């Protein structure tokens, strides 16, 4: 199995795999709202492809087996803001679901994110699964999102302290707000 940084050439296949895995309503999900208008962060955004038929017998040569993406977002408290990184989606194609590929993609991507000093990483997911990677809902209980989410699924991996009460916003929304503030004075 070949795991490498995603490139623009992978985008259409990643989108097709995400549509298959999460269905047509995936763009209405809260995490998708946070990604709106952003570009995935190069480096920890990875793809996994079959490069050895013995390792992935039910997949074709060079078939996309999985992907993990990272996106710039922000935490806002009044006029202050803090950069965060949104992890997700993580997707694994059906033929590769029993290979531990999701765990492998997450571990490798987090190692790259740490080497790049991306700072606090947020995701919306299952604490029992993502807890093994250092994610917890402890600090996020009073954070608000631009869409629905169950509080216990809002997970953070961070070393430093962040505000207890804050809004999670898309990077594009924060940029619009900051440009309005600078114009208004």
Give residue ranges: language-model regions.
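Active-site rim helix/loop that mediates acceptor-substrate recognition in acyltransferases
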Residues: 11, 19-61, 74
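Conserved acetyl-CoA-binding loop-helix of GNAT-fold acetyltransferases
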Residues: 87, 92, 98-111, 123
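A short beta-loop-alpha structural element at the N-terminal edge
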Residues: 2-14
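Glycine-rich phosphate/pyrophosphate-binding loop shared by adenosine-nucleotide-utilizing enzymes
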Residues: 1, 59-67, 85
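A conserved beta-turn-beta hairpin within the catalytic core of GNAT-like acetyltransferases
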Residues: 73-87, 97
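Conserved glycine-rich acetyl-CoA-binding loop
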Residues: 54, 93-104, 116, 132-133
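Conserved active-site alpha-helix within GNAT-family acetyltransferase domains
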Residues: 115-119, 124-150
